[in-house]
């Protein structure tokens, strides 16, 4: 299967090179590699290899580097990383704009997908009425015992993502809503740890509150985001508010080093055209989190199965 996928991609690369693009010579892209960061959630890593594969199809060189999901914007600004392809508004918007204000990083456009990053529960928790009143946040006041675990000190547990993602955003919210006497926020070490906990809870039929996001592979299984007080500008503690508000529906952007349009004009033009939908991003994540493929193999399969999506971006 992998041999077939590699052959498909090689054929695609040859077709692109012969079919009027003339590869990197016509684009006059630099021989220096495009540095693409990888973070710690599946869609981002698969998409890194998908975009890298598209760049390689026009003859460009690509390198992948692990990078902190907040500090990456400084790395792009300083030229250590070339692009960021999943800039989530709620989590990374502030870091992105702070870097832009300093100079050296540019906005390369939005994906078609809109985003939500929020606490929620698997749909069966609502469907089976394990906590009557969900997904309204007020229901949590009377359901702490449903979400208690061995490590939650008798309180309901809220499983957040790694603390590097949001800092104390969720603990601050729980405190502002007066729920801190009934719930404790625990930080997962990785996205994989969240998925493992969700799978375990589903198998046991027990209640669980976790951080999650859309687009993601969980969209297909059913996941209900808790309806917290509406987000408004300035509602978070960092912006002068009390921190009780939920998360906004946001954009999903792309960012690039300011030299990228000059050093790799063809690749940069392609990058500005790239726009993934919610379903496409969910598919990328599902190949890893459900089908248990490696990130690299998932990207090869996605590229082979979706030539009609990405090839037009190269023309």
Residue ranges and their predicted role:
Residues 24-35, 55-56, 147-155, 309-315:
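Immediate post-signal peptide segment of exported/extracytoplasmic ligand-binding proteins
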Residues 29-43, 60-65, 155-159, 271:
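Short, well-ordered beta-strand elements
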Residues 42-61, 174:
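Short, polar/charged alpha-helical segment
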Residues 48, 67-103, 193, 197, ...:
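Pocket-flanking alpha-helical
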Residues 81-85, 159-237:
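Ligand-binding pocket segment of bilobal, Venus flytrap-like solute-binding proteins
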Residues 104-159:
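A conserved helix-loop-strand patch within extracytoplasmic ligand-binding domains
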Residues 117-130, 250-263, 286-287:
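A bilobed periplasmic-binding-protein/Venus flytrap-type ligand-binding module shared by bacterial periplasmic
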Residues 268-315:
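C-terminal functional modules
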